Structures are given as C-alpha cells and as structure tokens.
Amino acid sequence: MTLQQKIMNSFSGKVVRKDLAFLVKGGLPVPTYVLEYLLGQYCANDDEEAIEIGLEKVKEVIQNNYVHRADAESVKGNIREAGRYRIIDKVTAVLNEKSDEYQASFANLGLTNVPIGTQYVNSNPKLLSGNGVWCIVTLGYIHGEDIKVRWEIQTLKPIQISNIDLQEYIEQRKNFTTDEWLDFMIHTIGLNPEMLNRREKFISLARLLPHVESNFNFMELGPKGTGKSHVFQELSPYGVLISGGDVTSARLFVKMQGNREILGLVGYWDVVAWDEFEQQKGRNVDAVLIDTMQNYLANKSFNRGKATHEASASMTFVGNTKHTVPYMLKNSHLFESIPTSFIKGAFLDRIHLYNPGWEIR
C-alpha cells in the first residue's frame, strides 16, 4: 500500500490534495488555508470524478462569493438587489463605546461601521485583534427610509475547523512508520518529501513548533525563497504574520486608548511571526518594544499601563541572510542579519530554537 493510499484510508474525508489549492489560488491574495477549507468541503476524497466536480464547485464559490476589491461596488449592488448575499472577506471588529455596540469592517468590500452581533465577537475574539479574520458572511441590505445603517450581518463563520478529535489522530498514528509519518507531515505543509533529505525534513517541520507549543520562541534566518514565511502566513488561521515595519509595542502588546488598555496581537493569536526581521537593522528600534519583548519572552507576561498581562502566543522571528555561513563564521557571526538592539543575551538567551534555514535548498 502506498503512503497516499494509507493516508486516504486512515483519514477518509479529511484529506485535501495540496496541488488543488495551488491550482485554485492562481493570483488570489488569500491564504492557502482559506482555499483548503473550501476544498475540504467538496474535494476530500480520492475519486477523480468527484474531485473534478468538487473543484468546479470551489471555483464557482470563489468566483461568486470571494470579494475582489476592484469589484466591491458591484458586490454591494448585488447585495442591495438580492436583499442578502454570501461573501468571503477578511473581517475586523471594534467596540464603539458611544453607541455601545461592536462594529465590523470588511477589508475588500470596503464597508466600515457595520453592526455585528455580540455573539460573533464573543465566540471569535480574534475579530478584535486588529488583524482581521477570513470569514464566510451572509450580508443583508435593509431597504426603507430613515435607516441609519443599511448593512446587516446575518450569519458569520470564520474559515477554520471548529472541532478536532486529537485522539483520532493519535490512534491513526499507529498505522504509520516513523518515516511515513514524517513524509505525511511534510506533505501537510505543502512540500514534497522526495526533494528533501531527512535533516531538511526536520528543519522544515521545526517551523511548526510555535504552532503546537505555547510561548515557544523561535528564530529562523536564511536565504530568500526557502519558505520561511510560508508556514506562518499560509498554513493556519491561528497565526499571524506581520512585516518588520509594522511592529510596534502597542500593536504587539497593549495599546492605550484613553484610560482603557486594548490587548495587542499576542493576546489573540497562537503564533505571532515577525517577518523581514533583518530589515530593522540600522533603524532605531523602540526601546520600550525591546524591553517589553524581552520580558514577555522570559516570563510569558508583560507590563503596560497599570496592569500585568499574561499571554500564551509563541513569538517567531523570520529574516533573510546576506552572506553564506562560512562567510558569517569567518567575518562576523550567525546573528549578523538581525537588528543590533537585539544582539544581546537578554534577547538571544530566550530563543528556544534557532532554526538553520540556510540548510534548506
């Protein structure tokens, strides 16, 4: 029995072919996990005819429901004429204290200040993180006179698996050898195990550690184009990737709004990945950010405002190297790419794993 057959037999109805996601994605600016979620609904089997039918259905859903920014006004018109319409968009929520209600904004549709039910925010707190959550939303339009807000969120469902039976995976693991399971895991992150040696497989899988361990501090530096950011941007709806220039203490930890303390990204996500970390080199990095970061990496907590906050988000630092390893070892060190402000024991001693990204071809 081939590995593919064993996977299909052990996880029937849960397997999605990675090549289908790439086939569907094209130039769409959406994470791969959004497409895999849809493929899982229509193409989770090994029957070629059924897969072909399901693939067409997924393409139809994307064509009809995914909101392209260029088509936003057309979609609004469709909602108005039909009265309601289902869309796929990135949704963010905020609390409007003046009106005492939560309000949503839609990244591609361009709508803001749309009332959103408290039940949706309570069950999906990441909506408040400021980074947005990809959702399937049924959006209604209210006709009539003297209507303050015409848009109405009738249903909202985040694009993520709600229930996972971990025990089932533990039981099915017994059906695989260690090497088979290793290759299976490599497949799940979109890589071909036949193109990697055993060490490269483990280096690639090490990128998953921040996803499965709370408060795991991870760093990977390596050449461009080796997939460092992919795992943190495309794989899971529970992690967030932010670029180097967008990192501030307020965004990561706590933002003060009057007398209120608004929790930052570490309070909502399982993994916060700092991309293009090396681009901060030569810039004046906020001293408050460095101090708060070091405290969080060490103690899983941070002090901002009047309170001490605890969080379980893993921190990941991803960046590119400019030189080869032999050059760095001879002329500087393996941390030469990162900002000078972070090259000190108080920061580096708190990194649990420095993944050698330069070994990935």
Can you name each region flagged by the protein language model?
Residues I142-G144, N320-T321, W358-I360:
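Generic structural motif
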Residues T178-L182, I290, K344, L348:
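Alpha-helix initiation and N-capping motif
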Residues M1-T188:
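Extended, charged/polar low-complexity intrinsically disordered regions
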Residues S129-N131, I153, V212, A307, ...:
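A generic structural signal for short, solvent-exposed coil/turn residues
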Residues L329-I360:
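A short helix-turn-beta junction within AAA+ P-loop NTPase domains corresponding to the substrate/partner-engaging
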Residues N192-Y327, N331-L334, D349:
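Conserved ASCE/P-loop NTPase catalytic core
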Residues I170, K174, K281-G282, T340:
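Generic alpha-helical structural element
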Residues V121-N124, K228, I338-K344:
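Intrinsically disordered, low-complexity boundary segments flanking structured domains
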